[in-house]
A protein has these predicted regions:
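Mixed-charge (Asp/Glu-Lys/Arg
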Residues: 1-47, 52-155
Length: 155
């Protein structure tokens, strides 16, 4: 019998963006259900939102965006979708209620109400550093925004 040898640590696998998105959707499903929320997934991928999140008294249209690449000490999230013939368009309250950004390498979640991000099309999140203007940090792990008695509360 051969003695065991220690293997070199595995390098992280860089998946394509579609696979990363699928894994983030699975992680969101697990996280939300663990916190007591219920989720439904629309049939197909033609809607502007990825999930319907049920808090009891309210249904939220949730668009999930994930990012895994660190650029200039931050993570970029594009709050846009494509329309044939019109190009890239920013989300509005007619499209979604909540944009959820998943920072994959550190498993951090930002729950951003659409009113907070409109009309921005690009967000830069800095979960690892303190910034002078922490514009989005108040939405980091802000699961409390989904609680029934908190829906109208401003952050």
């Amino acid at each position: 019998m051969k003695p065991r040898t220690t293997e070199a640590p595995r390098k992280p696998v860089h998946r394509n963006t579609k696979r990363t998105g699928e894994l983030s959707e699975a992680a969101f499903l697990l996280k939300a259900e663990t916190l007591g929320f219920h989720l439904a997934k629309p049939w197909g991928d033609s809607d502007r939102y990825d999930f319907i999140l049920d808090t009891g008294p309210r249904l939220w249209r949730v668009q999930l965006k994930c990012t895994q690449v660190l650029r200039a000490r931050g993570y970029d999230v594009q709050a846009i979708y494509s329309i044939y013939g019109k190009g890239k368009v920013g989300y509005t309250a007619d499209d979604i209620d909540l944009l959820v950004a998943h920072i994959v390498p550190i498993n951090v979640w930002y729950l951003l109400p659409i009113e907070a991000i409109t009309p921005s099309k690009s967000l830069r999140l800095y979960p690892d550093i303190v910034t002078k203007n922490p514009r989005w940090e108040k939405y980091r792990e802000a699961w409390h925004l989904l609680e029934p008695n908190q829906e109208s509360r401003k952050v």
